[in-house]
C-alpha cells in the first residue's frame, strides 16, 4: 500500500505546495460529487472546464487514467493516505 501511494504521488513532487493541494482538493471534490464536472465546479466555484483541466493534469502527473476504475481507486487511496498523514 505504501508503495502504491508513493508511486501515485511521486509525480507531484516538483509542484509548489499550493498548486499540489489545489489538484488534490479538485480530485477529492470531483469524487465527492460522483465524478460530476458540473457539481465539482459548483463546489470549487470555477468553470467545469477548469475541473477538466485540473483532472487532466492529475492524469499527467500520475500516469493514471481517470477513466479506468482501478486507477481511480489507487488515486483515491493515495490522496486519502496523503490527507491523513501529511
Describe each model-derived feature in a short phrase.
Residues 1-86:
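Cytosolic nucleotide-utilizing catalytic cores of signal-transduction proteins
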